[in-house]
Amino acid sequence: MKEYFNDIEFKVKDNLKLKSNLKNYFESDGFIAVENEKDQLLFIKKSTLLDGWKLNILNWEAKINIEVKQKDNVVIHHNVKTKGFGFITPVAFSRLFEKYLYHLESYINNNECYKSKNIELIKLGKIKMLKYIALLILGIFTGLCLGSVLENMTGIELLGYLGVIIGFKSTEMMMNKYLIKKNTLQHSV
């Protein structure tokens, strides 16, 4: 499964409350601060077997490494990955992840309220995720139909089960390939 990587850099207007604001922002969404050094912060979200099926994309396994350079420059390295069977690539949600970090910049520099904006991002992510799950279910149903036809034609019961698995995996592979290509092209323009 292709992972999502992004690096964002921005200038900070006021450095006095930078670390506490960064901690507030990420901890409000359930990230855990595991490293808190002078010029570096690391926030993580641990993985579970169900990461790819979680509707809230901010609950997927993630690592956010923040470097403070020259006291007024912040560099964020954001990595999201999903593991296991039946997952949607995090690359499909790259625009939502970018907006999430843009909201951080607005919060740090302009003290803008981010909670309602991030809740809206989570809602959009859930809607996208439900659409992708519906496509997977459609693929399973198509595989079930084809498997049943083959089972009835040959009398081999195993072909019915095999149709479901093939329907699911082929839908997952085609959908992820399309989503990766679509999002990669959007970011290269």
Ranges and model annotations:
Residues M1-D7, N15-K131, T142-E151, G167-V189:
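Ser/Thr-rich, low-complexity intrinsically disordered terminal regions
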Residues L136-F141, Y161-I165, K169:
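Alpha-helical transmembrane spans of integral membrane proteins, capturing the lipid-embedded, hydrophobic core
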Residues V149-I165:
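Hydrophobic alpha-helical transmembrane segments
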